[in-house]
Amino acid sequence: MDIIGGQHLRQMWDDLADVYGHKTALICESSGGVVNRYSYLELNQEINRTANLFYTLGIRKGNKVALHLDNCPEFIFCWFGLAKIGAIMVPINARLLREESEWILQNSQACLLVTSAQFYPMYQQIQQEDATQLRHICLTDVALPADDGVSSFTQLKNQQPATLCYAPPLSTDDTAEILFTSGTTSRPKGVVITHYNLRFAGYYSAWQCALRDDDVYMTVMPAFHIDCQCTAAMAAFSAGATFVLVEKYSARAFWGQAQKYRATITECIPMMIRTLMVQPPSANDRQHRLREVMFYLNLSEQEKDAFCERFGVRLLTSYGMTETIVGIIGDRPSDKRRWPSIGRAGFCYEAEIRDDHNRPLPAGEIGEICIKGVPGKTIFKEYFLNPKATAKVLEADGWLHTGDTGYRDEEGFFYFVDRRCNMIKRGGENVSCVELENIIATHPKIQDIVVVGIKDSIRDEAIKAFVVLNEGETLSEEEFFRFCDKIWRNLKCPLIWRSEKICHVIARGK
């Protein structure tokens, strides 16, 4: 079943501009409170200008362009501007530092980068080492360094015409994005996402929350993540609704923003719900128009009930991952919800619980959650240049092994139990224990290291490191955290450490 009618992203935006014209498409609020608004017509023109900018810089169909940006209008311009000319977006987690960012540049084959002055010094060093294919950097800030190979994104964009200058033939099977996601190995894998994937995601996610063109979908989730892109942005645009993109999450500002923009749909992770609950009660707690809150694992029933009662909202559960593109299991619109179930398989999908021998299990039995979709259409196409990793999780007939455990009941409701992967879920982010261990182990004083997740009342899990030092060495807590801070931002830096004489358990699987 082809629900997108063979329409790629360039056609989508041209049609949206024609149909919705001056209706508000995008509202972006910066951390400083600056608000930018664009109608569907204006947004399509900005996307065209951005596509023309890339063309003048030598970008053609199939070229990869990396984005290292926080939530901002430029992210949206670049995402769809690249898609219009058949180029490929490579979003980089804005919290990553040098080593991980450089690795993604190398392995994605990105030749151009769009970033801000905040991140430029790091990429200047990477560019000088000439270890990647990166040949040019566009900065979204007004002020520019006096360096070769650097230009102003805004200045170049504003010089471009509002009509598209380069329109190569496109197919819905063409790659639109390579999104690198943390895995159980030491390095993230590039998830290949097609035009069809994104178009399908828009229709599917709009169906999941019964989105209409008079809705306002507000998100504070990072644009470099699949949920912001496919559950929120693509859903809003596909429905002709208004998409509100807030740069940074603030528990104190959240409800005021929801009221100001008259949001009707939003999305939350457990960390957000918990931080919203610790805010002082206010008479304005229910002064909003939200009818659905898209929710992603994991929350206790007590926390769920308290949140819904205080703020007068309903949680719509959705389970998925980067490889599934959308929440392939979840609550359905106008259907009964059964807490703590993660819902039922959505349309176009099949779901099973399988044992260690890949055999389906009956209701009530715990096993691996497996999903059947169509690669490149309803689930990801493949891991970029990694057929071995692709074959490990994706069967030839479209069955995807999620690596998560769960069970189902007799009525087809699924229940999440745990992640089989050696992962830590911290504040909505997947953090690989192996990745952290391998890098921390490079410290000259450290003989061995084990990283584990421990329960955290706000972020689900905190990161704890058990360190074994080389004989005769000493390492202070301050020195250890200073070393970690140089490698990672707050996302992956352990919050707790402990120096051990002997490490009995090695989390690397030894």
Swiss-Prot record:
It catalyses: 4-(trimethylamino)butanoate + ATP + CoA = 4-(trimethylamino)butanoyl-CoA + AMP + diphosphate; crotonobetaine + ATP + CoA = crotonobetainyl-CoA + AMP + diphosphate; (R)-carnitine + ATP + CoA = (R)-carnitinyl-CoA + AMP + diphosphate. Catalyzes the transfer of CoA to carnitine, generating the initial carnitinyl-CoA needed for the CaiB reaction cycle. Also has activity toward crotonobetaine and gamma-butyrobetaine. Belongs to the ATP-dependent AMP-binding enzyme family. Its EC number is 6.2.1.48. Pfam families: AMP-binding, AMP-binding_C. It is an enzyme of class 6 (ligase). This is Crotonobetaine/carnitine--CoA ligase. GO terms for molecular function: carnitine-CoA ligase activity; crotonobetaine-CoA ligase activity; medium-chain fatty acid-CoA ligase activity. Pathway: Amine and polyamine metabolism; carnitine metabolism. The keyword Ligase applies. GO terms for biological process: carnitine metabolic process; fatty acid metabolic process. Keywords: Ligase. PANTHER family: ACYL-COA SYNTHETASE, MEDIUM-CHAIN ACYL-COA LIGASE ACSF2, MITOCHONDRIAL.
